[in-house]
Amino acid sequence: MIDITLPLTDIHRHLDGNIRAQTILDLGRQFNIALPAQTLETLIPHVQVTSTEPDLVSFLTKLDWGVKVLASLDACRRVAFENIEDAARNGLHYVELRFSPGYMAMAHQLPIAGVVEAVIDGVRDGCNTFGVEARLIGIMSRTFGEAACLQELDALLAHREKITALDLAGDELGFPGSLFLSHFNRARDAGWHITVHAGEAAGPESIWQAIRELGAERIGHGVKAVEDRALMDFLAQQRIGIESCLTSNIQTSTVASLADHPLKTFLEHGVLASLNTDDPAVQGVDIIHEYHVAAPAAGLSREQIRQAQINGLEIAFLSDSEKRALREKVAAA
């Protein structure tokens, strides 16, 4: 179902949600951190979703073991490098990796700006080694509150030239976007693109707020948009992209089943929706699974899957010339 003549992208992919189980085991042993299991086979149920979680917050706890072993900046650099290696193995030409430096720093009180620098270094080295093109999106973890998000923002702005966009993720219901208006004003002043997790746990009003008040050019997940016809029209007319993550939305109980997922409706409505993974290691999936298994199960035709692939590059945070160069590179391969 993947069109090999077109660039394959993943523009909603959490770097700190894609820490390999083997790496968690390795780092746990290296730093003498007590893990819930001592073999790869027995560790996986603790770090990977093996059945549907009751809600988004429950799903997010599966990410915690990955960051609990980040006891040094070198460990952060390693997982960033491995994220690019994983992207290359999946056949991705372009990936936007998003990460929350405060979340990665928290367990071992690492310097947040140091985490940002380590991630930048690891991703750069990975891109040079594996030939994948990547951009970084900084996340503010709303769950930890406004002050913690300000610390994350300051650390990200210290490396503003290496960061492409700002995102807001975490507990959407408990920490609405209205708490973070000044944060996003600063991000836009820095020249960054804006994407926001919205309409995943909360309703269409969260998406409207992300667009109108935070300046979102893309929406992460956005599944509740289908509940508001005016919003659907607005998304299509204004070319505001939706970063769809099929398997993730089932695992978080955001959507009841793949057959109920709104991605097909988005595409039929002319919304620029794309296919992405979200947290591949935690979910136990990759981009190939999303195209070959999840998308057909969600009712997408072959042409709709191809359109979603096209949309992934269309709404990527790249210039027109960068997109053109990537298309030409893939076409010539």
Curated annotation (Swiss-Prot):
User: How does the cofactor attach, per the note?
Assistant: Binds 1 zinc ion per subunit.
The Swiss-Prot or TrEMBL record lists the needed cofactor(s) as: Zn(2+)
Q: Which PROSITE patterns match?
A: A_DEAMINASE
The answer, when asked if Hydrolase is one of the entry's keywords, is: yes
The EC designation for this entry is: 3.5.4.4
Where substrate is bound, by residue? 14, 16, 170, 279
- Catalytic activity annotation: adenosine + H2O + H(+) = inosine + NH4(+); 2'-deoxyadenosine + H2O + H(+) = 2'-deoxyinosine + NH4(+)
- Per the Swiss-Prot or TrEMBL record, the active site comprises 200 (proton donor)
Q: Name one GO biological process term.
A: adenosine catabolic process
Pfam families membership: A_deaminase
Enzyme class at the top of the EC tree:
hydrolase
For the site Important for catalytic activity, which positions are given?
A: 221
- The residues that the entry says bind Zn(2+) are 12, 14, 197, 278
Q: Which GO terms describe its molecular function?
A: 2'-deoxyadenosine deaminase activity; adenosine deaminase activity; zinc ion binding
Going by the UniProt record, its keywords in alphabetical order are:
Hydrolase, Metal-binding, Nucleotide metabolism, Zinc
Cellular component (GO) terms are: cytosol
Family, per entry: Belongs to the metallo-dependent hydrolases superfamily. Adenosine and AMP deaminases family. Adenosine deaminase subfamily.
**What task does this protein carry out?**
Catalyzes the hydrolytic deamination of adenosine and 2-deoxyadenosine.
UniProt-recorded name of the protein: Adenosine deaminase
Source organism per entry reads Salmonella typhi
